[in-house]
Amino acid sequence: MRRLIAVIMLLSTAVLAVSVQAENLRIVGEDKVFVATLGSGEELPITRQMTPCAKNKGWLQPLVPEPGIVPVTEIEVLNAINDPTFILVDMRTEDWFSDATIPGAVNIPYTEVAMRLDELGCLKGAAGWDCTGAVNVVGFCNGPVCPQSPTAMRAMIRDGFPADKIYYYRGGMLDWDALGLTTVEGDF
């Protein structure tokens, strides 16, 4: 009986080890290799693996996705929540938003933001968007490896939204959660 229990435990440990084996992920958009040269002269490749703590499979997004966009931290996000000159936009898809978001955020998915610039103070005209009355937008998605908000911000700028009115919270929900800050279910 003891042998049977030992064999079962050994097999379950082996299965568990295989199931949590890390998946290699890109660090940045292209397949670039980063190498650190140690004091001994040994070269050590820097890798990124999908582990239980690495929640997203994307790749690191630049701190400033486009020239003119202002990067912000949690402090600026907290200050923007009740500031009438700002709108906090969760640029993730509706399923992510409905699960949890930052209090006070509205959901404009990254795939829709260019069609909904009127909600951000722009006027639709025959020649395109007039964004002279645009509000300040704090945009975020799932975190440093999430491409959704940078994609949305590029589309906003392409369609006439002023880059200097876009504030990018690159840390997104990953950092917000890691810091233990309050979240709410998204309200449509």
Task: Outline where the language-model segments fall.
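Bacterial N-terminal signal peptides
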Residues: 6-15
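Positively charged n-region of N-terminal signal peptides that target proteins for export
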Residues: 1-4
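Mid-length scaffold segments of soluble, non-membrane domains
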Residues: 70-136
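Flexible, polar/low-complexity N-terminal or interdomain linker segments that lie immediately upstream
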Residues: 17-99
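A mature extracytoplasmic/lumenal domain signature
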Residues: 92-95, 101, 112, 141-143, ...
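Active-site neighborhoods of enzymes that stabilize oxyanions during catalysis
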Residues: 179-188
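Catalytic cysteine-centered active loop of the rhodanese-like fold, especially the PTP/DSP P-loop
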Residues: 121-176
